[in-house]
Amino acid sequence: MNYTTQMDAAKKGIVTKEMEIVAKKENMNVKDLMELVSKGKVAIPANKNHKSLDPEGIGQGLRTKINVNLGISKDCYNIDMELEKVQKAIDMKAEAIMDLSCFGKTEEFRKRLIDMSPAIIGTVPIYDAVGFYDKELKDITSEEFLKVAEKHAENGADFLTIHVGMNRKTAATFKKNPRRMNIVSRGGSLLYAWMELNNKENPFYEGFNKLLDICEKYDVTLSLGDACRPGCIEDSTDASQIEELIALGELTKRAWERNVQVIIEGPGHMTLDEIETNMKIEKKLCHGAPFYVLGPIVTDIAPGYDHITSAIGGAIAATHGADFLCYVTPAEHLRLPNLDDMKEGIIATKIAAHAADLAKGVKGARDWDNAMAKARRDLDWERMFELSIDEEKARRYREESKAKSKDSCTMCGKMCAVRNMNRVTEGKDLNMLRDDD
């Protein structure tokens, strides 16, 4: 193999098997895709050690992809349950899964996840550091943090989320500009704490060249984390968030010089009117790199319904440039999600992604909706169920309602507009009063 990474291959004019697969999925010319990869506008996360991967592209002109978060925690240390969630995410065709495990020895779960998953796998190495070394956070050395990142890359993680932009300059900006919610990024808060406790620079920022060595070796995509993402609408688009984004733009160029693919992570909580501006700022400051957003969550008052607040924000964000949506479940801010929460979160996020693809004019996006419109016009219930984003729920609602006619539902009965327009255009009587037709 005469290339190191997908980006290196693209710059050399080499079409990889991963590019061929992605181009076919996206209904696009593989040479056009290769050009986007060479410029960093599209990333194809594909670790050389992830043998079960069914690759996907993330970025400009492609379908909006979604990510599912899962992982073991101290309060819910159940590997079998988390593996059930993995299977659920795979069955529901999530393009990516992030292992956010944050307690104990996580390698067993991570390796099993990567072995079984055709989806892109992402991890956050700093979550693993305390358990990896059985050390207090402040006692972990800079070199040890990098070794954890290398272990995750060696295991086969396709992208690593690392909050490199939380450097001393960003930290100083944060201190000068108090926030209502401080730092709500788990990884960002851990790095900030380590820096404060040790009076040192961010080990990933200081050792960025070594981090790039790791990414280049395994063809790991670097997902530059947003330590200063807003945790409430009052903190959005503030000095800390923008200062960090400027740093991420500079780091992006350094990574691309080494042929390391980059994804930029983004907010967070913000009101509807700020979303479009934030998408444009990221694309400008980070040179068109793919943008990966959590939500955005558009109001802070809906615990139990944050899959909805997130889907609203995600649809707007993806319409205006976000390429990758992290799902949010009804359990957000309340507990570790269960399987039912997962399903709700995946469905809501897939709806947001598809709605944005329609608005962006992504090739082929309208085909699904047009097929549903035809099935509805034809009153073809079976086809409607097959096309539904949640087939099980659609079937259940229909079966529970016990409509008297196969041509209608319990909402309108024989006053169904579709039924009556079909009949009248065919020259048939409406037969509104008889039950036998």
Curated annotation (Swiss-Prot):
InterPro entries: ThiC, ThiC/Bza_core_dom, ThiC/BzaA/B. Disulfide bonds: none annotated. Signal peptide: none annotated. Substrate binds at N69, M98, Y127, H163, S185, R186, G187, D226, A227, C228, R229, E265, Y292. Its cofactor is [4Fe-4S] cluster. Keywords: 4Fe-4S, Iron, Iron-sulfur, Lyase, Metal-binding, S-adenosyl-L-methionine, Thiamine biosynthesis, Zinc. Pathway: Cofactor biosynthesis; thiamine diphosphate biosynthesis. One of its GO terms (molecular function) is carbon-carbon lyase activity. GO terms for biological process: thiamine biosynthetic process; thiamine diphosphate biosynthetic process. Its EC number is 4.1.99.17. It holds the Pfam family ThiC_Rad_SAM. Zn(2+) binds at H269, H333. It catalyses: 5-amino-1-(5-phospho-beta-D-ribosyl)imidazole + S-adenosyl-L-methionine = 4-amino-2-methyl-5-(phosphooxymethyl)pyrimidine + CO + 5'-deoxyadenosine + formate + L-methionine + 3 H(+). Binds 1 [4Fe-4S] cluster per subunit. The cluster is coordinated with 3 cysteines and an exchangeable S-adenosyl-L-methionine. It comes from the Bacteria. HAMAP family: ThiC (MF_00089). Catalyzes the synthesis of the hydroxymethylpyrimidine phosphate (HMP-P) moiety of thiamine from aminoimidazole ribotide (AIR) in a radical S-adenosyl-L-methionine (SAM)-dependent reaction. Belongs to the ThiC family. This is Phosphomethylpyrimidine synthase.
